[in-house]
């Protein structure tokens, strides 16, 4: 009950109690169980498939709250990854329900900095921050020349932290599987 109940403020200003639905509870429990019982990276990882509007963001909150409440799992670094500004704003508001500070990553450099620490913190980042890009021409120069070159292809982000106590929870992951992100 402690990890699967949150209080949220609505747009009208009312505070409401939100209780985890069965499918959210089941998914969150399975994630926690896999982290505890999995012997390999593969057996500790997985995919949770939710339909649109089924409460993916809240499921992520319930997982995080379960982890923070468990003495053997509370030291995990959490990385909540999304792919759109509006989704980041929604997830940011929902992530505050976990409790504690939520770091909103604004740049690739800041992402490297936060990932490289041993802190068991909560970080939110947009997926494109994992790409290393080097601009060939600034937008101003390209505009003056009348040349709009395609953005340069991203380079591999590389390993920043070798800890196995990092959890990535990716919202709308299917949209990252095309173009330079896939």
Label every model-predicted segment.
Residues 102-116:
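Functional beta-strand-loop-alpha-helix junction segments that form "active/interaction loops"
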Residues 65-67, 108-112, 152-157, 182:
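A generic local structural motif
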Residues 1-77, 82, 86-101, 118-119, ...:
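ATP-dependent helicase/translocase motor core
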Residues 142-150, 155-182:
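SF2 helicase catalytic motif II
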Residues 87, 129-132, 175-176:
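Residues immediately C-terminal
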Residues 119-131:
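Conserved two-lobed SF2 helicase motor
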Residues 134-137, 180:
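Short conserved micro-motifs at the rims of enzyme active sites and ligand-binding pockets
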């Amino acid at each position: 009950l402690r990890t699967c109940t949150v209080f949220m403020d609505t747009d009208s200003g009312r505070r409401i109690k939100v209780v985890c639905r069965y499918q959210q509870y089941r998914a969150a429990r399975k994630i926690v169980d896999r982290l505890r019982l999995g012997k390999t990276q593969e057996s500790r990882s997985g995919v949770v498939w939710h339909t649109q509007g089924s409460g993916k963001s809240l499921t992520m909150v319930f997982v995080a709250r379960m982890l923070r409440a468990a003495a053997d799992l509370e030291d995990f670094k959490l990385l909540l990854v999304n792919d759109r500004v509006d989704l980041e704003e929604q997830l940011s508001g929902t992530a505050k329900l976990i409790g504690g500070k939520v770091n909103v990553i604004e740049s690739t450099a800041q992402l490297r900095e936060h990932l490289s620490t041993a802190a068991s913190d909560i970080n939110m980042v947009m997926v494109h921050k994992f790409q290393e890009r080097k601009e060939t021409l600034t937008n101003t120069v390209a505009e003056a020349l009348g040349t709009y070159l395609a953005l340069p292809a991203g380079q591999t982000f590389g390993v920043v932290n070798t800890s196995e106590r990092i959890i990535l929870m990716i919202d709308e992951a299917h949209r990252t599987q095309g173009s330079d992100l896939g």
